[in-house]
């Protein structure tokens, strides 16, 4: 199916709906205009009481003389008439064109307003300026019909010409009732339509999916960078929507469902939008949480309504973001099989591949928790194809940066390949944030273009947080932080299998970091060896060991370091088989492969004995203790470098990789320290200053 056809179909649907609404409102306006016209006609019609009409008929027996319009003259009467909702004293005369109907008497009269004469107020005379002729009047008759006979006899006796009114037609007889009923029906329809609209309190069972046309999306595969493999996987879906006959003549069928899995921020939603933009078909977008409601059965009703809307516009795409909110494994909830979420999931399973499933609807979904999804949802026939949208490699990051810097004025010295190299592990959202941070920093510094310095500072802001220059520490705490970070940097520089140190700083950043040591990998890594994990543990422990060597006590600042080191050691024992317990896995994990913290997946220890658990704890303690001894030995040998680096940090607060290398090379007693190759008798520097441990510990 071509792109033009999809857009035209959706535009026609919208145009028909708009025309129907316009016609409805025009009809509603016509009814209101008719009622207003009837009200205006009645307002300008003079009402005459029955008794006044009898008096006027009796007075009309005499010869009327308009030159003698005085009180008591024949042919007229003085009455109080209600005209235009105002009660006035009027003189009524010249009764004519009388029409006698079953419920009312109509005709024409002449009216002239009376004005008081003198100050007593008992004399009135007509005001010729207010004379109105041919005024329509109406006198209502009683339902019993006796008044009609009496007034007809009086009119005949007065020789006043009259005629009987024609019998009222069905419309005239029931016009007010019909108009009132139409108005009430129109009001009820509008109220029900408003209540049933999305977002209203009564729209329980209606789907909250939003329909997008191709021109509203404006996104194609050219806007998607860094995930070329994922794009190639989904191109077949677009090709099928454009020309399905190519696949059908070979007996093939398009996947009914495509599941996009990957870490947050990698572009899963963007890829789905690009598919809809390329295919040119209607695109329904909604979140998994849109099906969840406090009322029982609402989620299943919304699923059915969503597919009904989609089938009416097939071929089309339904995109469900955050599918894990809807499709978690059944039976895991507290409420068991009667859980509302499970009813919603069952409805989705039936709609995707049941007796009444529609092949013209393609379901796409995105999640970063595929391990929590129900197996029935992932089987072939529902989500046939699983597309991994993983973190981009260095080439992918460079392509993503090229997309985001299109509207950014860059300095000629900016090398996007270098920026991609210093951002391993960054996803598309991180890189977009990095470019924006660099542009903001350049604007804050009144620069005309964004340079490499802004990108480097942006990387630090994204990874370590914002600098807290107003957070002032006392000299004792600042010195302790300097030794702590110097210990990290020195051990990371000395050990093999560690990432190069890019920067050491004692400027507080983020929420709780009083200092940081930034290491940048030289490339993308997918595996870690046992020696690399041990080196990482030693780097984490170096800060607190440096504090202990210099100050003979430790502070609370190493809390996060100890937590991370212990976690690595425990995983080495329980998951990776890197301990004396052998190549055995002791943990059943439901951790997410795409979330940095593992998500909230449940982890439990396999059925092992108490003795094995005790041995695991002993192995964790052994790995930590051996790492502490190695770190202590390195820092004892490199104490001169530790003190020199600390003094430099106290002066400038930040040391980059080049200056770090210079300081360590100048104060090193020999080649780089490698565990197991240290000289037996290594002399310490005799020029080291003596530092007294402060009494105040660093917190946080």
Curated annotation (Swiss-Prot):
Gene Ontology CC: one annotated term: plasma membrane
Catalytic-site annotation from UniProt: 485
Top-rank taxon, per record: Bacteria
PROSITE patterns (UniProt xref): AAA
Localisation per UniProt entry: Cell inner membrane
Record keywords, A-Z: ATP-binding, Cell inner membrane, Cell membrane, Hydrolase, Membrane, Metal-binding, Metalloprotease, Nucleotide-binding, Protease, Transmembrane, Transmembrane helix, Zinc
Entry EC number(s): 3.4.24.-
Stretches in topological domain Cytoplasmic: 1-20, 193-700
Cofactor note: Binds 1 zinc ion per subunit.
Pfam families xref list: AAA, AAA_lid_3, Peptidase_M41
Entries under PANTHER family matching the protein: ATP-DEPENDENT ZINC METALLOPROTEASE YME1L1, METALLOPROTEASE M41 FTSH
Family from the record: In the central section; belongs to the AAA ATPase family.
Name of the protein described by the UniProt record: ATP-dependent zinc metalloprotease FtsH
The organism of origin for this protein: Pirellula staleyi (strain ATCC 27377 / DSM 6068 / ICPB 4128)
Taxonomic placement: Bacteria, Pseudomonadati, Planctomycetota, Planctomycetia, Pirellulales
